[in-house]
C-alpha cells in the first residue's frame, strides 16, 4: 500500500482462490506463479517479483497499454466484478511466457490452459471466457504452439 501497488487482491487469505497471484522470476530465466497471501518473503530471496501493476506497457506518450492477455480479457468480456482478474492475468501471463520458452503441440493446448488457470476461482462469470481469451492470445502469437502433422508409417 505504501508503494500504491494495490492490484494484488487479498481475498481468501489462504492461497486457495489465487486472486493474489504474483509471478516470481529467477536468475535462470524461469518463472512461476505463487499466491502472495501465503508466500513468505524469504522464499522470494534471489527472485524478482512481478505484480499485476507490472504487466501492462506504456506507449510513447506514456499512456498505459494493456498486455495481450489483459486486452483479450477485455475483448472477450471475461470478467464481471474483476476482483479475481489480477490472478487470472498473472496465471495466463506466466503460461504465455512459458510457452515462449517451450512451445507445446497444439493438441495439448486446451489441457495446458486449463491446468494454468485451474486454481483461480471466479465467483461471477465462470471460466469459459477466460479460457477463450487465453486461447486466442496463444494461437495469435507465433511460436507458442507447434502444429504436429501426423505421418502415416506405411508411406515411404
Language model features with spans:
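Signature of N-terminal electron-transfer/Fe-S-associated modules in redox systems
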Residues: 1-156
Amino acid at each position: 500500500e505504501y508503494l500504491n501497488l494495490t492490484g494484488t487482491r487479498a481475498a481468501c487469505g489462504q492461497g486457495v482462490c489465487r486472486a493474489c497471484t504474483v509471478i516470481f522470476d529467477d536468475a535462470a530465466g524461469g518463472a512461476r506463479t505463487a499466491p502472495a497471501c501465503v508466500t513468505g518473503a524469504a522464499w522470494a530471496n534471489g527472485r524478482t517479483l512481478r505484480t499485476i501493476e507490472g504487466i501492462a506497457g506504456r506507449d510513447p506518450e506514456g499512456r498505459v497499454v494493456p498486455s495481450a492477455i489483459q486486452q483479450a480479457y477485455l475483448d472477450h468480456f471475461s470478467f464481471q466484478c474483476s476482483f479475481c482478474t489480477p490472478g487470472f492475468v498473472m496465471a495466463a501471463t506466466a503460461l504465455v511466457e512459458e510457452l515462449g520458452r517451450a512451445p507445446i503441440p497444439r493438441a495439448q493446448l486446451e489441457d495446458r490452459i486449463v491446468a494454468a488457470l485451474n486454481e483461480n476461482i471466479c465467483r461471477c462469470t465462470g471460466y469459459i471466457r477466460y479460457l477463450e481469451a487465453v486461447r486466442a492470445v496463444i494461437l495469435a502469437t507465433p511460436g507458442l504452439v507447434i502444429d504436429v502433422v501426423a505421418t502415416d508409417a506405411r508411406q515411404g
